[in-house]
From Swiss-Prot:
HBM1, short sequence motif: residues: 150-158
Location in or out of the cell: Spore wall; Spore, Perispore
Organism: Encephalitozoon cuniculi (strain GB-M1)
Listed name of the protein: Spore wall and anchoring disk complex protein EnP1
Record keywords: Cell adhesion, Glycoprotein, Signal, Sporulation
Function: Spore wall protein involved in the adhesion to host cells surface glycoaminoglycans (GAGs). Microsporidian spore adherence is an integral part of activation and host cell invasion which requires the extrusion at the spore apex of a very long and coiled structure, the polar tube, through which the sporoplasm is pushed to enter into the potential host cell.
Description of its domains: Heparin-binding motifs (HBMs) are characterized by an XBBXBX or XBBBXXBX sequence, where X is any neutral amino acid and B is a positively charged basic amino acid, and are defined as the consensus sequence necessary for protein-heparin interactions. HBM1 motif is necessary for spore adherence to host cells.
A cellular component term, taken from the record's GO annotations: spore wall
Coiled-coil segments: none
GO biological process, one term: cell adhesion
Domain of life: Eukaryota
Length: 357
């Protein structure tokens, strides 16, 4: 009853509140209500009378979908619904239907008015006008809030998904000012290939054991050596049934040389790694596009993938390899992502190598 009373009071004072979309971290995607509580906001109560305004808000903010925690007085905080910018409303699924945003409401006080407590949060009666970056006209926070004529309207700028051209490539951050050494770059995740093999006797009555094998491989290119001499030292670290370390020199035309050990037969480099200079430029171009450092991988078919942040996996599609004009990042999710990780990925890194290792 207490919760129902809060909802009634909140709905009666909704004109004094403004809609807001909270961006969720990876941990918050499966429990969006915690983000609403941490932001000191109220859960947005979606119903037939305000669903069109909510859809317009998503379209104006360039948000494809967002969680809603109430629908027609039904409490959905445990199992939220996902509202799309096209009007579709679908139930939450942790594998196939998640969102990066959650809709909530926060106080929108009018200047000179007293704030009223709504459900434990401060709601108000003033007008703070908001406009969305790139929108044609500003949208008022509330129709009830009337601002004095002699007072110039105040606009608060909200930037959602800023244009890549306005971004500055992110540099590694140093938190230890006392250390003069170079900052440690972001450690990329590893995705080993996991397979199961049956072993043991084939005789009747003897159960066969299942052995789980894990294998992974990381290619590291000394790109500075490539720029100076026209050759690049490639270090390949393999971890499978036994750890293996390989190092060889790759010329500009992709030929391997400098290996005189007949007992050590090097595995051929994948075709997509034969031009590390172009691959390094591609990685830097993607980092400028997304305005952050990314991790690069390839699969057994030599498809190129990047991991942006800790959650978003993309396949790199390049139609024009000369200037990357038609570069497209195609997101991999759901069943395809699980299958991709199951079959394993090879890491691709660039950096100076210690030749004494």
């Amino acid at each position: 009853m207490k919760l129902l009373g809060f909802l009634i009071v909140g709905l009666s004072a909704i004109s004094a509140l403004k809609t807001k979309a909270l961006h969720l971290t990876c941990e918050q995607e499966l429990r969006p209500y915690s983000a609403v509580v941490d932001a000191n906001c109220m859960a947005f109560a979606l119903n037939g009378s305000n669903i069109h305004e909510a859809i317009k808000y998503l379209q104006a903010m360039n948000i494809k979908k967002a969680y809603v925690l109430y629908w027609n007085d039904h409490d959905l905080r445990g199992t939220p619904m996902v509202l799309y910018d096209n009007g579709a409303l679908a139930p939450f699924d942790p594998y196939t239907n998640t969102a990066k945003y959650v809709l909530c409401v926060e106080a929108c006080p009018c200047p000179g008015s007293k704030a009223a407590s709504v459900g434990g949060f401060q709601a108000a009666t003033s007008s703070e006008k908001i406009y969305v970056e790139g929108s044609a006209r500003p949208a008022q926070c509330s129709e009830v809030c009337i601002e004095p004529v002699e007072r110039r309207p105040h606009y608060k700028k909200i930037v959602v998904n800023p244009s890549p051209s306005n971004c500055i490539p992110c540099e590694p951050e140093c938190y230890d000012s006392s250390s003069s050494s170079e900052c440690n770059k972001k450690r990329c995740k590893t995705f080993p290939r996991i397979c199961k093999e049956k072993c043991g006797s084939r005789r009747r009555g003897c159960p066969r054991k299942v052995e789980v094998l894990k294998s992974q491989k990381t290619y590291t290119f000394d790109i500075e050596k490539y720029r100076r001499r026209g050759e690049v030292v490639v270090r390949v670290c393999s971890k499978d049934s036994k750890e293996k370390f390989e190092r060889f020199i790759l010329s500009r035309n992709g030929e391997i040389r400098g290996n005189n050990n007949k007992n050590c037969i090097l595995e051929p480099l994948p075709k997509c790694l034969r031009c590390p200079g172009q691959l390094h430029k591609l990685k830097k171009h993607i980092e400028r596009k997304v305005c952050q450092e990314v991790c690069m991988y390839i699969n057994a078919k030599c498809d190129i993938f990047v991991l942006v942040g800790d959650c978003d996996f993309y396949r790199v599609v390049v139609n024009d390899r000369r200037r990357y004009r038609n570069l497209h990042l195609k997101k991999v999710r759901g069943h395809k992502l699980r299958e991709l990780i199951k079959h394993g990925l090879f890491g691709v890194e660039f950096g100076p190598l210690d030749l004494d290792r």
